[in-house]
Amino acid sequence: VAAGVAPEIGEQSAELEAFYVRALEAIREGERLANSPNRLMLFEPSFEWVQLGPNSVIPVFEHDGQTVYSPHIYQEGIDPGTLDDAVFERVHEEAAMNGGVPVLTGEWGTQPRRATDPEDDYFERHQGLQDKYRVSATQWLWREACGDPHHARNPYEGVDPAMWGYYDVDCPSNQTIGFREDYAAVLRRPLMRAAPGRIASILWDYENDRYTASGTMARPGQKLLLFLHEEIDVSQLTLTGLESPALEEAIGPGEIWSAITTAEDWTIEVSF
C-alpha cells in the first residue's frame, strides 16, 4: 500500500504528516475489518524530492513497525543531480527521522537503450549503491503502453514514444514486438528475500558473476531466503554461520534457496 501527496499543492510539513497518520489509521482499520494481517505502508516525500533537495518536505509521523520510506531515486535517470553516495546517505538520514524505517526506492530507472551502451554504467552503479546502502528497489514499470499519459504529447509533436520497460512496443498499435534481453541482462541478479538478524553487507559482482551477503545479530535456527536468477548446484554455495542449504522453490529459470543460521554472524557466497 503506497500513500503520497505533493507538498507543492499547499501542504506544509505538519499537514503532510497528519495526512500519513490518517492514511495509516484508515489502512489498518480496513485490514482489521477484513481480518487481514498488517501490510507494509510505503510513504513518500514530494515527487520533486530530487529537485528540491534538502528543502523537500520529509514527513515525520507516528507509525507502527510496518512502514517503509520510499523516495524516487531518479538522479541521472530522468532528473538532474549526481547519482552517488551522498544521495543514499541522505535517504538513510531521512529514514532515521522516522525511527530508522527500511527504505525502498519506489521508482528508479531510465531509457532501456542506456543498458546497451558500454560507456554508460547507470544501471550497474544504481544497483551497486542499492546494495551498499541496503535499499530495496522497484523500477518504474514492466511494460509501457502507447496510451501512457507520459506520452500524450508525442502524436502532436510527431515523435514516436520512447517506451520504457522490458518490452519493445509498437505505437500506435500497442502490440508487443519483443523482449529486451540486453536490458533484462543488466537487471538479472540475485536478491535477498529474507535475512536473519541485521544485514551487514551485500555485493553483486556482475563482472565476475559472484554474489556475497553477510549479516549479524542473528539467532541460531533462523532461516535465510535468497532468490537466484538461474539454476545452481549446492556446490556453488559457500556458507559461514549457516547450514542445511536447500532449494525451496523454482520460479521460471530462477530459484529460491534457504539456509539455517548456526551463529550470530553469517555469510553466504554464490558463484555462477
Question: In which residue ranges do the predicted regions lie?
Answer:
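Short, solvent-exposed turn/loop segments enriched in Gly/Ser/Thr/Pro and often Arg
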Residues: 1, 45-48, 140-147
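Extracellular glycoside hydrolase catalytic/binding regions
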Residues: 2-135
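Aromatic-rich peripheral "rim/lid" segments of glycoside hydrolase catalytic domains that contact
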Residues: 58-63, 70, 115-241, 249-272
